């Protein structure tokens, strides 16, 4: 394998897939079209229900059929999702587009990390994973920050224009994926090209058994998965509802890129800080991160404009610092043949929590007449998990 070319393709994919220019404005655009926060929450719940359904199957497909093929298929789904969203006439088609996007993200999650880790493993460079992972994260965040500037083009692009441009970026990311090389680090992976469809049921059954055995043998993996899922809830929902929250406070829609840009900068700084941190106890590290994330989420929900923006930055920076170490530790403790499957369990648990969380946060906001009310409640709950972790005597390293 040409590792230099492989990493170039991985970095290119991370950048263009991160240019999701709709992330900064989609809630505000849908609200401007007459959709309530509850309806937007329903669409988001559809996303997470589909994600929950296909997270583990997509990881299994990646382990059985190949990580590269799965990533390319996900890129195609992402392009179709953006095209459908561009011309969606009602909530049903909005939900259908969200379902396609969720299917694509299910294919990406776990698979991209597994391909990157095993590419380094094939070349005997697993010690470089933290650095490469940090580079990927920072490229994605840089792309997200650049993409957030698209909110300044609202009067020119309109609703459909945002999604058509996003489809072009996703197509470029899929093309970069197609140029990658499938990493081979085990005998099972080497036999992929020779296996027939008749072999797949038996291979699938073996993969399920081996994955369950791996989870039982490594309780630390389960703890890492749950901790990441809990922290990712405020990470996404603050970005989702801060848009409407700022509009309520008088912030112009054309300037919604500013908090998104600053949040992206905070994420990059968080990754850089995480790269330099070496926590002795992941339990204590989680506790501190949960307290900070909870506090930041509460600020987004209850503070005035500057406090709201600072809270969003705090949440994004802290969670990315934690996820960098969680991702490396999880990859270190799970086997290569089940890597994509087990990392997909990580995303599945997140989706399982997001299905009720998204509409509930929106419903609380509708009930109180303020988009931030639900975020304030969520922030308190997340902070309580950090307090509970600090209260336990057992340490997880």
Where are these regions (language model features)?
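C-terminal transmembrane bundle of multi-pass solute transporters/carriers
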Residues: 44, 68, 240-397
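Loop-to-transmembrane helix entry/capping segments in MFS-fold secondary transporters
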Residues: 37-38, 123-136, 253, 334-346
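Cytoplasmic helix-loop-helix junction between adjacent transmembrane helices
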Residues: 99-141
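C-terminal ends and interior cores of transmembrane alpha-helices
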Residues: 76-90, 291-304
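Helix-loop boundary and gating motifs at the non-cytosolic
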Residues: 1-53, 218-261
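Juxtamembrane intracellular "pre-TM" segments in multi-pass secondary transporters
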Residues: 1-4, 181-225
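Helix-loop junctions on the cytosolic side of multi-pass membrane transporters
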Residues: 166-195, 390-397
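Conserved MFS/SLC helix-loop-helix module at the cytosolic interface between two early adjacent transmembrane helices
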Residues: 52-89
């Amino acid at each position: 394998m040409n590792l230099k070319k492989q990493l170039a393709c991985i970095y290119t994919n991370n950048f263009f897939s991160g240019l999701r220019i709709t992330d900064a404005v989609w809630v505000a655009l849908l609200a401007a079209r007459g959709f309530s926060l509850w309806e937007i929450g329903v669409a988001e719940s559809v996303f997470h229900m589909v994600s929950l359904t296909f997270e583990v199957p997509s990881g299994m497909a990646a382990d059985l059929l190949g990580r590269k093929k799965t990533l390319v298929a996900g890129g195609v789904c992402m392009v179709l999702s953006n095209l459908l969203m561009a011309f969606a006439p009602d909530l049903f088609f909005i939900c259908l587009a969200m379902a396609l996007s969720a299917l694509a993200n299910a294919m990406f999650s776990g698979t991209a990390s597994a391909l990157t880790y095993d590419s380094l493993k094939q070349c005997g460079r697993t010690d470089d994973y933290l650095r490469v992972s940090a580079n990927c994260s920072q490229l994605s965040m840089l792309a997200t920050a650049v993409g957030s500037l698209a909110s300044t083009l609202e009067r020119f692009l309109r609703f459909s224009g945002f999604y058509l441009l996003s489809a072009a970026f996703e197509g470029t990311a899929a093309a970069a994926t197609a140029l990658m090389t499938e990493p081979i680090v085990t005998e099972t992976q080497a036999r992929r090209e020779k296996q027939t469809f008749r072999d797949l049921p038996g291979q699938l059954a073996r993969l399920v058994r081996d994955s369950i055995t791996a989870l039982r043998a490594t309780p630390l993996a389960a703890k890492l998965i749950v901790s990441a899922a809990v922290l990712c809830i405020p990470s996404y929902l603050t970005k989702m509802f801060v848009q409407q929250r700022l509009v309520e406070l008088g912030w112009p829609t054309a300037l919604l890129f500013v908090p998104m840009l600053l949040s992206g900068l905070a994420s990059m700084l968080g990754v850089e800080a995480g790269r330099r941190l070496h926590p002795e106890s992941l339990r204590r590290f989680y506790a501190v991160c949960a307290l900070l994330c909870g506090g930041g989420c509460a600020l987004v929900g209850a503070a005035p404009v500057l406090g709201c923006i600072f809270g969003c930055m705090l949440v994004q920076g802290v969670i990315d610092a934690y996820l960098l170490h969680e991702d490396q530790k999880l990859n270190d403790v799970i086997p290569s043949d089940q890597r994509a499957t087990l990392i997909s369990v990580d995303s599945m648990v997140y989706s399982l929590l997001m299905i009720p969380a998204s509409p509930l946060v929106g419903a609380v906001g509708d009930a109180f007449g303020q988009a931030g009310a639900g975020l304030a409640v969520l922030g308190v709950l997340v902070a309580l998990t950090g307090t509970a972790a600090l209260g336990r005597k057992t340490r997880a390293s």
